[in-house]
Amino acid sequence: MKRRTTAVLTLTALLGTALTALPVQQAGAEEVEQVRNGTFDTTTDPWWTSNVTAGLSDGRLCADVPGGTTNRWDSAIGQNDITLVKGETYRFSFHASGIPEGHVVRAVVGLAVSPYDTWQEASPVLTEADGSYSYTFTAPVDTTQGQVAFQVGGSTDAWRFCVDDVSLLGGVPPEVYEPDTGPRVRVNQVAYLPAGPKNATLVTDATARLPWQLRNAQGTTVARGLTVPRGVDASSGQNVHSIDFGSYRGRGTGYTLVADGETSHPFDIDAAAYRPLRLDSVKYYYTQRSGIAIRDDLRPGYGRAAGHLNVAPNQGDANVPCQPGVCDYTLDVTGGWYDAGDHGKYVVNGGIATWELLSTYERSLTARTGHPAALGDGTLALPESGNKVPDVLDEARWELEFLLKMQVPAGQPLAGMAHHKLHDEQWTGLPLLPDQDPQKRELHPPTTAATLNLAATAAQAARLYRPFDKAFAARALTAARTAWQAALAHPDLLADPNDGTGGGAYNDDDVTDEFYWAAAELYLTTGERQFADHVLDSPVHTADIFGPTGFDWGHTAAAGRLDLALVPSRLPGRDQVRRSVIKAADTYLATLTAHPYGMPYAPAGNRYDWGSSHQVLNNGVVLASAYDLTGAAKYRDGALQGMDYVLGRNALNMSYVTGYGEVSSHNQHSRWYAHQLDPTLPNPPSGTLAGGPNSSIQDPYAQSKLTGCVGQFCYIDDIQSWSTNETAINWNAALARMASFAADQG
């Protein structure tokens, strides 16, 4: 998900009253204190409070916090009018305790006015003894309206919070962030297939070949060889060697690679290694569902109340109005998936995510190595399991029903178009469970891009659900036809790039690719000449659409091209379509071969894009598709090497998939998978893909740690880093598709 800001200070925290207003100290080149009266020697002024009873106790500010609140910011203590200077480094420190122990304080430095940005936050678990806490960050903006706040709500029971020695010191030396990259031998930390490629990367200063050994779980060397020096890798700035141990065909668990005095993280060699990830990557979607209670018996540790069913404090989603001036009706837009780390629901991202899940299933029907039963009925532990419909189709239908609801009703202006998105009026804070979201919900204007996403996915659904539910398939096809005609009538209704308050803009100024994709899906489902003609006449049809950064929600031509190549049809010139996919795969294969980390991804200028992890995987999808078209093992092997990257063979030596690998991402930016901020909440479920390196590092936390980063190092596993570490439904769809392909190769 793309966004510009995430609000994490709320109006509630501003309701307290400051008793005095003291002069503001300006930050300077030397260390300068920005907090006034952080020692509470004789008074609590100018600190304000909200929903606590506070006073002095032994030279500390102590507050009695009521129980029964929901959110951290429901009770708070803070100080406003803090001056911060852009580019200045600050040390935020304090002593704090809690009675009884085990309660959490959310300590934040941010903006006291809209949009309530947060620049530093931490959520320590307090003990009854004073604990000392210190954090360093760099201010991303100039402001005289900063705020230091201690948010102490969200507890069922009453407790006592005490704080002292609060300091925000400007002019301190910036901390140098050094990620712990572990052993210098980088491997796929999950597994390699016995008959598949097996490659690793060694980070070393050596320029000559070095010996390596493959050891089994007992420490016995089972294979050996010499590394291949590759020089300095541009994507990481590291001097590296390659290791190829693909000739070893044994099976087992707990293997390690040893080279240059380093021992890799352990991994397996197992034909069934990817089967759990195939399931977990799709199970992810159940816990993303809106409008339904998540059952703890189906997802232990992730049970929660239904979100956005018009039960207070929710204000949606059963009768959601439009933004002012957009429409005069309301729509029932319950259901669907929450898009990413927020509570928004977006047609364009929902569209590409649904397409990729449906295509994962469709591949199982058409590919020589496909296994339809692998995601069949009963495999995903869903509420719908047991209904004789493949579980992957049950899950995708939850989103499809929402997409259909976003269509403008007949008789209304722009009938047949699809609203672009639905989300909160303002940004909300973290953590926040879906059923506790208090914000007003709004429909945003219909767009051509959203309408064509609906047309494409509904048309695809019509052919795939027909064997299981003819009525739904017919309804989907009718909606797709209606959307297509509406898009033809309104070909240039574009999303406002500035419409990014409360949710991502998802703006797209070129919908030629969406027209092509929708026409392709409608043709593949109906076989009608009108849609074939649009496909063949489109400039997209013969264009080189497979760029270095792959495809995503804003670049959907590949969705149409891949399906035209893979799904049987009588399209004239289909052989040329298939050859274009194979040609693209050859390009990605050349990129992979040249890359010291074996990635089918080399963005221009080494500028890693937002959500780069899923772009690597989608380039792998093209390689996998070429394998399905040709049967050539080189394409299968290339696709599998893309999985190596996301599962640990990378510069940071970590798996970007939660729960998979010795070291994996687990603090993704999310309002309810927020264990880092609230120990009572879970981390993301196993099988959740992190966005991955992003050279633009748009969020303040990443900027404070990663400024000047090189390619693969532009990532940090922290919940505050929404630009490098969010989770999103379209990203996980790429993982699901590739995990399913990999599992089929075992």
Swiss-Prot record:
What InterPro entries does its record include? 6-hairpin_glycosidase_sf (IPR008928), 6hp_glycosidase-like_sf (IPR012341), Cellulase_Ig-like (IPR004197), CenC_carb-bd (IPR003305), Galactose-bd-like_sf (IPR008979), Glyco_hydro_9 (IPR001701), Glyco_hydro_9_Asp/Glu_AS (IPR033126), Glyco_hydro_9_His_AS (IPR018221)
* Active site, renumbered: 342 (nucleophile), 669, 717, 726
Enumerate the CDD domains for this protein. Answer: E_set_Cellulase_N
GO annotation, biological process: cellulose catabolic process
**UniProt GO MF annotations:** cellulase activity
Q: Which domain of life is it from?
A: Bacteria
User: Does the UniProt entry include the keyword Hydrolase?
Assistant: yes
Q: Which SUPFAM superfamilies does the entry mention?
A: E set domains, Galactose-binding domain-like, Six-hairpin glycosidases
Signal peptide boundaries: 1-29
Keywords on record: Carbohydrate metabolism, Cellulose degradation, Glycosidase, Hydrolase, Polysaccharide degradation, Signal
Question: Residue limits of the CBM-cenC domain?
Answer: 45-170
Which cysteine pairs are joined by S-S bonds? none
What is this enzyme's EC? Answer: 3.2.1.4
Task: Show the catalytic activity.
Answer: Endohydrolysis of (1->4)-beta-D-glucosidic linkages in cellulose, lichenin and cereal beta-D-glucans
Q: What segment(s) does the record annotate as region Catalytic?
A: 212-746
From the UniProt entry, list the residue stretches annotated as the region Linker: 171-211
Q: Which family does it belong to?
A: Belongs to the glycosyl hydrolase 9 (cellulase E) family.
Q: What does this protein do?
A: This endoglucanase acts only on crystalline cellulose.
Identification of the protein by name: Cellulase 1
